[in-house]
Amino acid sequence: MTMADFDWKARFGPIIDELEKDGLEHWATQLQQQLTHRFEDRPHGDLDRWQAALDQLPGLTQIDAQLDQSAVTLTSRQPLTVAQREQLELGLRGLMPWRKGPFDFFGTYIDTEWHSDWKWDRVSPYLSDLSGRRILDVGCGSGYHCWRMLGEGAGRVIGIDPGLLFLFQFFSVKDYLGDVPIDLLPVRMEALPADLETFDTTFSMGVLYHQRSPLDHLLELKGTLRRGGELVLETLVVEGPEGFSLMPEDRYGQMRNVWFLPSCDTLLRWLDRTGFRNARVVDVTPTTTDEQRSTDWMRFNSLQDFLDPNDPSKTVEGYPGPLRATVIAEKP
């Protein structure tokens, strides 16, 4: 197995061609340069191992997908043999840890660290109808929510996330489904051209608090949307008045890259100042150890290890425990 076994040009050639045909030549050119750098100039040392795990997955036919259920579910009208089930398990285990999900591959249930379906259930009642919409999902992880968007009738879904293990987990689903209008690009938000103004809905869930400049992130998100487009923003918040924002001294819940946790009123002010309209908080929910926890598919530390063992309402650093708000707003 060599690095050449991962053919990034074959993987991403179709979406690069599509962007060119859609009049987004500047994005297509920039993306090709970024992917060349990612996979040729500085290839990740685990690419061959992850490709080997994908290659382990059995080839199956007569496949159906249920994308409107809690678990993104693949089924086959052709029953799997014992050997195929063993291959499937080995391949999927080779892509551990699985953090975002859950997924069900032909009866093999992947109980991921996060119950991402709970977040979807909180957000989805407040969304504009996704039917036919072109959607961007920023920080999409392995693409769980992208699949749920497709299940709601989205016309085109593009997820972006720099994590390459997430990319291969995404491939494990897409390779079974073939030509479906969904792609995951292994890039960061700042790698997108400014002012694309091409998406009907842009999601940014669990990203804002990782930004050193949250207002710049909001402006970047606004630039992805067409006029009248919808932003769906989910982030960590704290209780407090308008103008208040918590900046951790160092870590928050053992995470180093957490910068700003605003109050809900502060978050609404940020959206107003960055030019969004009709911003409203639609949900505020504490994250519990039922929603985020270690499992057989993610065996590392999880939320219970990041909370004060004597007071689970606080992080181990003494800050308020994780509280997540979802805000929806429009671009004028």
Indicate where each model-derived feature is located.
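N-terminal accessory regions of S-adenosyl-L-methionine
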Residues: 1-116, 175, 247-249, 268, ...
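Conserved class I S-adenosyl-L-methionine
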Residues: 133-141
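Conserved SAM-binding loop of SAM-dependent methyltransferases across substrates and taxa
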Residues: 142-153
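A short acidic, Gly/Pro-enriched loop at the edge of an enzyme's catalytic core
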Residues: 192-202
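A short SAM/SAH-binding and catalytic strip from SAM-dependent methyltransferases
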Residues: 200-214
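A short glycine-rich, Lys/Arg-flanked "PGG" loop and its adjoining helix->strand segment in the class I
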Residues: 215-230
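Short, glycine-/aromatic-enriched active-site segment of Class I SAM-dependent methyltransferases
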Residues: 236-258
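Short alpha-helix
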Residues: 259-275
